[in-house]
């Protein structure tokens, strides 16, 4: 089972690929997709879509796991995040991948044991739980690993 974990965002999207081979979890890859805030939104969404598509084609995941969105007090920010999620979900659908969504607190609790863990705690635990993640320093990337990890350990596939 290969899971593509996604921490959705318009400016800095985290992605990660984690596999379950027999009883072992294996980190395969992760990264950040950054868009320029000066670019038109449709160009930013197209860039996210095409870059994430390359990840899907390279790693051939069986499923995508994505963090659920919380509604921000800033409606413009929430709307832009919704655009990014829509572009991502459209791509997931185009490749006929199953998809699971996880609340941020569920991911934090699964990884750290505490549903309100801070970013640095998440990053620390990901490095302990999955070998190969030692060089990850970006919290968006670590969150994507954590989302894929949560999908696999909760057997939500």
From Swiss-Prot:
Its main location: cytoplasm. It catalyses: Endonucleolytic cleavage at a junction such as a reciprocal single-stranded crossover between two homologous DNA duplexes (Holliday junction). Homodimer which binds Holliday junction (HJ) DNA. The HJ becomes 2-fold symmetrical on binding to RuvC with unstacked arms; it has a different conformation from HJ DNA in complex with RuvA. In the full resolvosome a probable DNA-RuvA(4)-RuvB(12)-RuvC(2) complex forms which resolves the HJ. It is found in: Cytoplasm. This is Crossover junction endodeoxyribonuclease RuvC. Mg(2+) 1 binds at residues 7, 140. Its EC number is 3.1.21.10. The active site is at residues 7, 67, 140. The gene is ruvC. Belongs to the RuvC family. The lineage of its organism: Bacteria, Pseudomonadati, Pseudomonadota, Alphaproteobacteria, Rickettsiales. Transmembrane segments: none annotated. CDD domains: RuvC (cd16962). GO terms for biological process: DNA recombination; DNA repair. Binds 2 Mg(2+) ion per subunit. InterPro entries: RNaseH-like_sf, RNaseH_sf, X-over_junc_endoDNase_Mg_BS, X-over_junc_endoDNase_RuvC. Keywords: Cytoplasm, DNA damage, DNA recombination, DNA repair, DNA-binding, Endonuclease, Hydrolase, Magnesium, Metal-binding, Nuclease. Its cofactor is Mg(2+). Pfam families: RuvC. It comes from Rickettsia peacockii (strain Rustic). GO terms for cellular component: cytoplasm; Holliday junction resolvase complex. It comes from the Bacteria. Mg(2+) 2 binds at residue 67.
